[in-house]
A protein has these predicted regions:
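Beta-strand/loop substructures that line and gate deep hydrophobic ligand-binding cavities in soluble
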Residues: 82-132
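Short, highly charged C-terminal tails/helix-capping segments
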Residues: 141-148
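Hydrophobic pocket/interface hotspot
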Residues: 19, 29, 53, 72, ...
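A generic structural micro-feature
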Residues: 2-4, 47, 62-66, 90-94
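Glycine-rich portal/gate segments that line the openings of hydrophobic small-molecule binding cavities
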Residues: 41-84
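Intrinsic-disorder/low-complexity, polar/charged segments enriched in Ser/Thr/Lys/Arg/Asp/Glu/Gln
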Residues: 3-9, 16, 40, 52, ...
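Hydrophobic ligand-binding cavity/cleft-lining segments
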Residues: 1-39
């Protein structure tokens, strides 16, 4: 895959099953995926190989939204997700590919994310910053051990 890319790596204090579920549950995804200052609406989500999803991020200040969707290319429960993203806005052309790898480690899950094919009009550092913010929210969702 060509184009701009970001690579992220984290260790989360949660088992791979919980981290994987945060990527394939619409309610969970809406809670953690939008970066700071945005809300997310999951319009549909069919987490299976060949399945599709559609979501929108809305800027809380301006109320402007941008929508995107994609297709699930590969899913290995608790280990791997590979999917595409394509913006509805014609000014954001191309297809982005995202690979999420999960590995059980002694203290939880090692998470690696590669996002490739980012459109040239989107600064890569802004993508990276957005992912960093989202991953903080992901940790806040999956790390607590709440019994009940």
């Amino acid at each position: 895959m060509t184009g701009n890319a970001v690579r992220l790596h984290r260790v989360l204090r949660a088992p791979p099953e919980r981290v994987y579920r945060a990527f394939v549950s619409a309610d969970a995804l809406a809670k953690w995926i939008p970066p700071n200052g945005f809300t997310a609406t999951i319009h549909h989500m069919e987490p299976k190989v060949g399945g599709t999803f559609k979501m929108s991020f809305t800027n809380f200040t301006t109320q402007q939204s941008h929508s995107f969707g994609g297709e699930y290319l590969e899913l290995i429960p608790n280990e791997l997700l590979r999917y595409t993203d394509k913006f509805d806005d014609p000014n954001l052309p191309g297809v982005i590919q995202v690979t999420v790898s999960l590995k059980a480690v002694s203290c939880g899950t090692e998470l690696s994310i590669v996002q490739e094919g980012i459109p040239d009009v989107i600064p890569v550092e802004m993508c990276y910053l957005g992912w960093q913010e989202s991953l903080v929210l992901l940790a806040k969702l999956v790390e607590p051990e709440i019994q009940q």
